[in-house]
Design a protein with these regions (language model features):
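Polar, glycine-rich mid-to-C-terminal structural blocks
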Residues: 1-45, 53, 239-242
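Acidic, low-complexity intrinsically disordered tails
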Residues: 425-454
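Flexible loop/turn segments at secondary-structure boundaries
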Residues: 5, 49-51, 57-62, 108-112, ...
Length: 454
């Protein structure tokens, strides 16, 4: 149940006790060798996903209630659990099974076109986004009270702590509209500013509900009650790590002052408010890219238990049409290379190739920095895939170490390019033995998505 400095001290004490002969059954394992084995398994299977206990707990809003020992399957939910207590075979105290009600905002629906000096461009309508955030938080809080709970432990946890997980999707679609490459410094700045706004308004929306309906049962003693917001716990985490915080902290001073003052006076309706789920299924249903992920490619096949779905990047097609280059012949060429435009010589302008690179050709370190810019504003975590275009364990070590240094709470799949070839036909039924199973551990083992997080 320990983490942070307490774990460091207890671990060192245990090692010393073993050295002194007080512990008999133990063996020494070089840390580097153990880490290499973990990386090798990750490369071969994409599992197990790496999550970081210290960030999850040092930043946990309800740490006075318990320790975060694990996440959900998709690694965006980081809540504590408690075992039920028994005496003589009878349950004497109902424990807590962490559950969280999820919802995701389609950011592309908040992008509007404007004309300036005869030139058109796109911008995010933040007034509309604010309204959507407040509506979504209210909706998710309502779900807590009308939901079905399969166990008493799940009901106990959800009704006491009232966590919700409001996320986003279509981030890369919006970046395409704004002509920003997802793995650029401009993208890092954009994500920092966007998620600061999203964090401030989500917190404020929950506090407004607290004024109307009362704060959640275990609010007293939480980080919220101590005026420690997600950005504050992020700074505490980076100080513990000895790392410099990313960015400049709160930039929307007036909005944060209103939010902090409201929480101080009325509390929070929900112990946790924000979490970025994968949203693959609902994202593709809505015709947008999942969650905060980069486009996998401009053309690929998405599989779930309902079948195979042909996913195309409409932004790419629109850009090609604007250049007068889109044709059935070009479409066939793109299909022949599995949507990897770098394999086409002379058929597509270089700027389009750069804009629509596959996820494997992106700068992974920039994508990690983008995610760190998001994570610092969130009270829960982000389902975040890593894309590997290398066979080097050193490279894997470097990207996972960068995740840890950046203050990320969790990572999701390690996607390896060699294992991600796209089928060239959508009409042929897949003969793969690793069929996808909705909402199950088997789906995860077979490379599928957990559809409960969609």
């Amino acid at each position: 149940d320990s983490f942070g400095k307490d774990f460091d001290n207890r671990y060192q004490a245990m090692c010393q006790s073993a050295e002194d002969g007080n512990v008999k059954n133990f063996r020494k394992t070089p840390a580097k060798e153990l880490w290499k084995k973990m990386l090798k398994v990750l490369f071969e299977t994409s599992h197990p996903w790496c999550t970081f206990k210290d960030p999850c707990n040092i930043r946990y809003t309800n740490q006075h209630e318990g320790v975060v020992h694990s996440s959900n399957l998709c690694t965006e939910i980081t809540l504590h659990t408690k075992a039920s207590k028994y005496k003589s075979g009878e349950k004497t105290e109902i424990g807590e099974t962490a559950v969280c009600n999820l919802g995701s905002i389609n950011l592309l629906n908040h992008v509007e076109e404007k004309s300036t000096h005869g030139k058109s461009g796109y911008f995010i309508n933040y007034d509309k986004l604010k309204s959507t955030i407040h509506t979504a938080v209210r909706m998710l809080d309502n779900v807590i009270d009308i939901n079905f709970y399969p166990t008493k432990e799940a009901a106990n946890s959800n009704l006491k702590n009232r966590p919700i997980g409001l996320g986003m999707m279509a981030i890369h679609d919006v970046l395409h509209k704004l002509n920003i490459n997802i793995d650029s410094d401009e993208s890092i700045k954009f994500n920092d500013e966007l998620f600061e706004f999203y964090s401030c308004q989500s917190i404020y929306a929950s506090s407004i509900l607290a004024k109307e309906r009362g704060f959640y049962e275990t609010y007293e003693g939480s980080l919220w009650s101590q005026n420690i917001f997600p950005i504050d716990s992020y700074n505490n985490l980076m100080s513990y790590k000895g790392q410099a915080p990313l960015g400049n902290g709160e930039t929307k001073k007036d909005e944060w002052e209103i939010s902090r003052q409201h929480v101080s006076e009325f509390g929070m309706r929900n112990s946790n408010v924000m979490a970025i789920a994968p949203t693959a299924t609902i994202g593709y249903i809505n015709g947008v890219e999942q969650s905060i992920e980069p486009n996998f490619s401009v053309l690929f096949v998405y599989e779930n238990k309902s079948g195979n779905f042909f996913i195309t990047n409409q932004h790419f097609i629109d850009d090609m049409k604007n250049e007068g280059l889109w044709s059935p012949e070009v479409a066939k060429l793109v299909k022949d290379v599995d949507g990897d435009l770098s394999l086409l010589d002379g058929d597509i302008p270089q700027w389009i190739k750069e804009k629509y690179k596959t996820a494997f050709d992106r700068n992974m370190f920039k994508l990690i920095e983008c995610n760190a810019a998001r994570q610092k504003w969130l009270d829960q975590a982000i389902s975040f895939n890593l894309y590997n275009n290398s066979t080097s364990l050193k490279y894997l070590n470097d990207i996972y170490m960068e995740c840890w240094k950046s203050g990320l709470k969790t990572t999701y799949y390690l996607r390896n390019r060699a294992a991600s070839k796209v089928e060239k036909s959508t009409s042929e039924e897949s003969n793969s033995s690793s069929s996808q199973t909705s909402c199950s551990i088997e789906a995860m083992k077979n490379g599928g998505e957990c559809e409960s997080c969609q």
